[in-house]
């Protein structure tokens, strides 16, 4: 028990250190390591190395001395006690363990020193590699700086030469050496000089084990002794700086940025504080950029690659030959068409417009001024054209003589009305056209081609002889090669004969005189020849050069002589044309046909017209869908001097207008739109001139001096509409003005009735009819629709209106319609039509008109009206009946019979 207590008490005296010695060494070594990253970044890391606390080896004789002393004390002292054997054994065991521990630690220390030596060698190799790279970067940067300096000097000299100061340096420009503040090599108080970069790059293992070496202030040195460049000395702030300039500066981060304000720390600075702030630089160093941060090689490589690509692109642009085009600009043009004409992308054109403040799409139209700015932006030349320039070059090129081939002659038959022009053509064509003409007079231009027994071909154009058809005769003369002047042997020279002579002379066409009706009693051909002398027509029998032939269309005599005379005249003219070119010609007649649309009779004068060609005829255009000859047969192409009917035009072209084949639809549309715009402007200008000024109109209204008769003309063909318009306008009186609202072709529609109602006009229908809806609307609105088939009646009625006879004595009253469903041949009676009354009533003895495709083909009286076998006075709607017409048997299934009666209207 006492032994255990003694051991417990002796624990406090056991120690591995000699008595009276204290361990004052530090157990922790601290330092800093700068880690480098990519793109020139770095970071300072604090490193601590802890040492284990342990006593050193005991000095020799310390144990024996202490024990001896103890023993001496024990022996000599009154209170001393000798060690027991167990205590002595314990102490010996502890000492042996301490010696073994010391040996083990010595071995570990030697191993650590070996590792440190190897790490130092590795760090030395890495340091050498970094030094080599830094030297290469420094040389490269110096070369780039020198190159930039040379470029700037060259630019400065060029600008000086441009301003007339070549060879004289600018005094206001500072010298390159004085571009920044001069840094003296004399040490500045409060600043320290960093060791060279190689000194600062200490081995990683060395800085991890050994404490960081504080940066000490450099000793004063003369400039000659320590020459340093301004960029190699960095002034570091150590401690407090008393200068006012430094007081005004904000605190900076190691990278040069402004650090946020921090409260002053109350702890005393540690010993290694200066080394922790060794990476912070002042404002001057931040401005000059003299820190350890540099651009990475990858960044420099990318920059050089970009510069190389940019230089290559600039070289290619400089070497590229820019194409400058002549861009034709009309009055209006779409963005898409403008881009096509400049051979540029549509997106680039839209971008250029956006820069000008114009937001446009590819289909939007631009005016000529805006388009001109865009073209100039792209560097092209601008050529402005007028709207009429779209017609330039439409006629084609001149034909070469070797390309011309013989063609048939075009013969126009002209003369006075009822002198037998159409009958003469029928005799030549062996047809019967004259019987179908209303009133026995021709009211359309007919074009035919006759093949003679000899194989030769002659193209005939039949023109009306009535006074109202002057324009038609003029058109016929303008396209003809030879004029056949038909003069009746019994009538002699008449007014329209004289007019035909004038038209032929104006067209510079040779004349062949055909003296017709020589078989009639009282015919005197010599008198005709004598009368022609007064109009400078001298026939061959009287010593002149004009051929004359006596013919009889009824007896068909003298026709062969007329054909020989025509061929002889054509041979003398040597008529030729080039069939291998685009077709050109004239529109002889045009009409609006139900079921086929607009139909134009054209005469091909040059080239060959083929099915599928794009044609511009007057103000209309279209693609030829079908072609018909004079006998109604479909053909694929038409040679020069051949008359044909063409289908596929968008509208009804004007009679006498030229037609031409163009390359594409865009050109055709442009020409058509321009011509339609010209027609609208001309019409508007004429109406404005006719109305006069507002003061003049008010004066006429107040005085009541001028009245107006408005008419709306609808005809079956364009030529008839023009003739009616000319006839009506000639009937003007000084107190009554005749105004034609419109003159068109086709049936009467509701829009025509509404226009006539608004203008209080009379609708004149020439060989056409109104639709059911238009007729009902006219009855409700009280619009007067008058139907005619002979132009004389139109002139008489309009003349009565002008003279103040507002209504004629007799007026037509509509009764009803009947549809022919079956045609029967009855002996001794003729043809009888089995009809079904579709509207109104049919009365016996009423007037009838036979309609075929809404065109009047016969007008007469109803001779018989039967229901089954009984004669009846009238048949109402919804019943069947039998009809027969007086003196007419050309009845067909599907024809419509219009019934009317004349009633007396009081004036």
Swiss-Prot record:
**Which parts of this chain are annotated as the region G5?**
552-554
Q: Which Gene3D superfamilies match?
A: P-loop containing nucleotide triphosphate hydrolases, Translation factors, Translation initiation factor IF- 2, domain 3
Q: Where is the segment annotated G3?
A: 462-465
- Specify the tr-type G domain's residue ranges: 406-576
Record field: compositional bias (Low complexity): 211-230
Q: Where is this region: G4?
A: 516-519
Q: Name one GO molecular function term.
A: GTPase activity
Task: Give the span(s) annotated as Disordered.
Answer: 1-305
Q: What NCBIfam families would the database entry show?
A: IF-2, small_GTP
Purpose: One of the essential components for the initiation of protein synthesis. Protects formylmethionyl-tRNA from spontaneous hydrolysis and promotes its binding to the 30S ribosomal subunits. Also involved in the hydrolysis of GTP during the formation of the 70S ribosomal complex.
Q: What is this protein called?
A: Translation initiation factor IF-2
Q: What is the lineage of its organism?
A: Bacteria, Pseudomonadati, Pseudomonadota, Alphaproteobacteria, Acetobacterales
Gene name tied to this protein: infB
